[in-house]
């Protein structure tokens, strides 16, 4: 009986050790489907060479993956730029930090009603994201296109428009839902990941495309304190590899730009 008990305890100990080893070699990353999860699929075999298993969890919003990373359900996430991350930490009290930059997604202005931004009529309706950083970013694009003028506030809303010569009307929409408004508005300012998901080609379809000098690089994000763990270091190295850079350049053909 004692021998049986000892054998069972040894087996249990081995099982626990194996599970701990498996966890240390498994990297769970949350991402939006396009392009982030697509890029992570390229990272999988690179990490496998170093003995790591990459699990990709897909999300269709910008809130859940950050909360899951804060809570430890994800080792990292990959979907956001630094202004959004900073604003999220401030509003939610989270402790998330960036590690490496991966790519830039130039935001664009799209329409099913007009073919050229010069054809935009007075009183047209414009849909823009409603989260603070992407809303401000969208308004900056419209200002750079000469459609409106803004004050100097760092984060802008339609209330910060100081000149609106075309008397444009603005609808603030949840970021992921902006592409769905294209049938109802004249123009929509859409994040590139959601544009691609809606089968829009930023290079061919955007009436206005954000400057390539935009500061909105997308980063790998982890909870503070985890940035130097072996598996995060392995993830950072793999996602900044030449294989990933080549994939971004070929797959997205200028719609998305490598940032390393």
Report each predicted region and the residues it spans.
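Periplasmic-binding protein-like
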Residues: 135-143, 239-259
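A conserved helix-loop-strand patch within extracytoplasmic ligand-binding domains
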Residues: 99-148, 245
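Beta->alpha turn/N-cap motifs
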Residues: 58-62, 72, 76-86, 103, ...
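Ligand-binding "clamshell"
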Residues: 87-99, 114, 184, 189, ...
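Short helix-initiation/N-cap motifs at beta->coil->alpha
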Residues: 56-67, 154-180
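A bilobed periplasmic-binding-protein/Venus flytrap-type ligand-binding module shared by bacterial periplasmic
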Residues: 106-117, 217-229
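Immediate post-signal peptide segment of exported/extracytoplasmic ligand-binding proteins
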Residues: 18-28, 47-48, 116-123
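Short, well-ordered beta-strand elements
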Residues: 23-34, 52-58, 125-126
């Amino acid at each position: 009986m004692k021998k049986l008990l000892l054998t069972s305890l040894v087996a249990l100990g081995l099982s626990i050790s194996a599970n701990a080893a498996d966890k240390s070699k498994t990297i769970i990353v949350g991402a939006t489907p396009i392009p982030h999860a697509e890029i992570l699929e390229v990272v999988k075999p690179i990490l496998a060479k170093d003995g790591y298993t990459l699990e990709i969890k897909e999300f269709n919003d910008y809130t859940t993956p950050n909360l899951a990373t804060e809570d430890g359900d994800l080792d990292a996430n990959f979907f956001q730029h630094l202004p959004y991350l900073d604003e999220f930490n401030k509003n939610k009290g989270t402790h998330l930090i960036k590690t490496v930059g991966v790519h830039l997604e130039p935001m664009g202005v799209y329409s099913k009603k007009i073919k050229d931004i010069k054809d935009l009529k007075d009183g047209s309706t414009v849909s823009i994201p409603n989260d603070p950083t992407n809303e401000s970013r969208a308004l900056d694009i419209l200002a750079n296109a000469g459609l409106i003028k803004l004050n100097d506030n760092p984060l802008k809303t339609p209330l910060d428009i100081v000149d609106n010569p075309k008397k444009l009307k603005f609808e603030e929409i949840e970021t992921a839902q902006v592409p769905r408004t294209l049938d109802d508005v004249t123009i929509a300012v859409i994040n590139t990941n959601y544009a691609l998901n809606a089968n829009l080609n930023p290079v061919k379809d955007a009436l206005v495309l954000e400057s390539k000098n935009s500061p909105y690089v997308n980063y790998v994000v982890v909870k503070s304190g985890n940035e130097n763990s072996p598996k995060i270091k392995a993830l950072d190295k793999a996602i900044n590899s030449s294989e990933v850079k080549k994939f971004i350049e070929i797959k997205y053909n200028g719609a998305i730009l490598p940032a390393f």
